[in-house]
């Protein structure tokens, strides 16, 4: 199975997500409007699918969902390399390979959900931008998994950049620049 074969953006999983988005609510749910684009991690997506502050809220939500899904897809391809190599052998048990891939996708989705929710604790209290949310994602994951062996943070940074989500107030998009820093002096305890 090649990377293209396992591209989640063109699989049944994405179709299920879109179907769920259509049926989950009235109007334009973000999942219904998500447009995922395959490509190199540093290649921007079509301008029509990039972040634009003038877009309607659901369309902006779709950009955020697409960026996160793009990052998850890249990590999935990385983490399943050995399973795909096994699948390429002539007598690989396809049912077992499929089960391994499904289990990895489920585990990865749970890990990404954990990062996405934990990041909320690191966001400013009001008027959060997508760039600030990326900083919160990077910080939350760095606190939980300091060494990042599977490149989750790198995948998130590349995906947000691909979808045109900018981060104000940082010199570059390195992990060190994106991490939220603690206060320079300790804050007094709250009584």
Which functions belong to the PLM regions below?
Residues 1-191:
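Zinc-dependent metallohydrolase catalytic domains
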